Amino acid sequence: MYYIATGMMLVCAVLVFRILPDEKPNFTGSYAALMRSLFTLLKQYPLLRLHSVRAALAFGSFMGFWATLAFKMAQEPFHAGSDVVGMLGLCGIAGAVTASFIGKHIARLGVYRFNCFGALLQLAAWGLFAAGGNHYGPIIGGILLVDIGMQCIQLSNQAPLFELCPSAANRINTIFMSCYFIGGSLGTLLSGTAWVLFGWSGVVGTGALLTALSLIITLVAKR
């Protein structure tokens, strides 16, 4: 499997080198100045902070589920191995299918609606995980919901940020994605701790709480 992954990465590297255009940097200055400019942008644009934080919380909820799913599936009544968990991961293709639709309709339906809808889908997923966590049906249904919900939240928060300052689009994306993965790491840490202390119910509570916080931020900000 690792050899296959290595081969695929090499193919991707060649394709990226051959296909993507060579763009000249639009920032002049030292690397240290470039890094400092990230904090300047974060301070300058409140919308960047808003979008980054609520997306990070939702991603923390998302990652909290995937970080502990293998532990859950190894227990009764499943006694399943990593192969089954990998097959469940294929359900995530639902997010990839909906990504195109979401991207096309952000401007028409609005960031606020997509964030609320995505958070509600995630909360519904955690409800399924809580009520039917010992059955494949609710687990699969929850995976579909949590993945589509995450796509709604990520894309609707990320895409509008590029319009804040087109000349600094790459740096703005760096800030967003850094916050995004910090949120994912936090969710993984919290869910792992919750699993050790409280089992699956602790994971469900942690994931639902992170999503609820993301939704509350959206409702309070009203944007």
Give names to the regions the model predicted.
Residues 6-26, 217-221:
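C-terminal membrane-cytosol helix-exit motif in multi-pass small-molecule transporters
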Residues 59-78:
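Helix-loop boundary and gating motifs at the non-cytosolic
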Residues 19-53:
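Juxtamembrane intracellular "pre-TM" segments in multi-pass secondary transporters
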Residues 76-94, 171-175:
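Loop-to-transmembrane helix entry
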Residues 163-200, 204-207:
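A late C-terminal transmembrane helix in Major Facilitator Superfamily
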Residues 97-111, 195:
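Helix-to-loop junctions at the C-terminal end of transmembrane segments
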Residues 112-157:
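C-terminal transmembrane helical hairpin of 12-TM major facilitator-type secondary transporters
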Residues 44-64, 140, 144-148:
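Pair of pore-lining "gating" transmembrane helices in MFS-fold secondary transporters
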